């Protein structure tokens, strides 16, 4: 049976990229472990969108890509490890003019060149993904990644959240453990993602459990900053109760607290 978990806590990132920035942040997230299906991908994305809506946000977008598209593309083009890192940095910095210059310097066939040309499209439509699928014939990793995104679109229609989802083949992550879809959420009032997530089917094997998994993490600090800058009030549920009692009234107090809990 799949396991569903949620959490809230502080995380620490020790990276040179975080110079001048806080290395500690608060995250709230959920994980679905033991289900490697596309329907599980859709469920987590739906939960991500629902979480954003429950926070009070109305204008946000979740960009969805696939980790294996980038790896498949660089493998098919025969890039060295150093070239792959150079390209990754250009894409991460959204330097697509640099990407164009980089790709022009490489020798490859027209199909691969057209696939590289999709890296700067932040909102791929069905027909563009279908065209990419045709171009990817003969390149299994690229083909599989695009096919997964097309199937995912169909699953997401059941949730009615299409307007919050966009598809971006140039989406990459700083973390190399992702094996399937990856996604990031953005809104007004913050330059950083407010939520990140993806599929990591091989990560748990390093901790003694071989299981498919997918999850997301809301960056609470970024979310709160966005809510403040958009003048969105965070709803406060005022239904808490405080029961004060003497030791002799312990049993009665417990019964009362349970009754209060069940009514809220």
What are these regions (language model features)?
Residues 1-57, 103-262:
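Positively charged, Gly/Ser-enriched RNA/tRNA-binding surfaces
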Residues 23-28, 64-72:
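Short, conserved phosphate-binding/catalytic loop or strand-edge motifs used
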Residues 50-54, 69-78:
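Hydrophobic mid-domain F-helix/FG-region of cytochrome P450s
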Residues 59-69, 87, 166-170:
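Short, surface-exposed recognition loops or helix-turn segments adjacent to catalytic cores
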Residues 77-80, 183:
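Short, surface-exposed, charged loop/turn segments at secondary-structure junctions
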Residues 79-98:
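Acidic, His- and aromatic-enriched active-site or binding-groove loops in soluble protein domains
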